[in-house]
């Protein structure tokens, strides 16, 4: 399901100046909590702007997310990286460094479900920006 939405995003987004980079998973096998995981994430960030998915972030509509994604593209800020934290969430220092923190609501979601939801919202945002029929209200 994740791969399907990411393929759709890549196909729809390409003509809009949005492209799919890579999906990178960081495993904190040594423990050390959120701070150690944040260091591992920082080491894998390609540079540029990153947004985090965090329950303390901004709750927004799908069109609002599309607008933010389009504005990020229009600023010419380069690649945008999306970060989903581990089981303990996002380290506060990493969250503070992010360009934006986004929440899928007040509930906490399992990591893999958050990946599906984010993948779908990326495709939906590209469809909204393209004026496509996928997003209906």
Swiss-Prot record:
Family matches, as SUPFAM superfamilies: alpha/beta knot
Catalyzed reactions per annotation: pseudouridine(1915) in 23S rRNA + S-adenosyl-L-methionine = N(3)-methylpseudouridine(1915) in 23S rRNA + S-adenosyl-L-homocysteine + H(+)
Gene3D superfamilies: 3.40.1280.10
Gene Ontology biological process: methylation; rRNA processing
Domain of life: Bacteria
A GO MF term: methyltransferase activity
GO cellular component: cytoplasm
Cross-referenced Pfam families: SPOUT_MTase
EC id: 2.1.1.177
Subcellular location: Cytoplasm
Keyword Thylakoid tagged: no
Keyword annotations of the record: Cytoplasm, Methyltransferase, rRNA processing, S-adenosyl-L-methionine, Transferase
Residues holding S-adenosyl-L-methionine: 85, 104-109
CDD domains for the chain: RlmH-like
PANTHER family for the chain: METHYLTRANSFERASE, RIBOSOMAL RNA LARGE SUBUNIT METHYLTRANSFERASE H
Quaternary structure and partners: Homodimer.
Family: Belongs to the RNA methyltransferase RlmH family.
Function: Specifically methylates the pseudouridine at position 1915 (m3Psi1915) in 23S rRNA.
Protein name: Ribosomal RNA large subunit methyltransferase H
UniProt organism field: Jannaschia sp. (strain CCS1)
Gene of this entry: rlmH
């Amino acid at each position: 399901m994740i791969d399907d939405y990411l393929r759709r995003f890549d196909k729809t987004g390409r003509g809009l100046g949005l492209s799919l980079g890579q999906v990178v998973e960081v495993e904190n096998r040594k423990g050390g909590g959120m701070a150690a995981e944040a260091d591992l994430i920082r080491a894998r960030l390609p540079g540029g702007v990153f947004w985090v998915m965090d329950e303390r972030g901004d709750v927004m509509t799908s069109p609002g997310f599309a607008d933010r994604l389009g504005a990020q593209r229009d600023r010419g800020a380069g690649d945008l990286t999306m970060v989903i934290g581990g089981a303990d969430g996002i380290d506060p220092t990493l969250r503070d460094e992010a360009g934006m923190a986004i929440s899928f609501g007040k509930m906490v979601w399992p990591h893999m479900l958050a990946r599906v939801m984010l993948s779908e919202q990326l495709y939906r945002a590209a469809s909204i920006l393209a004026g496509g029929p996928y997003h209906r209200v």
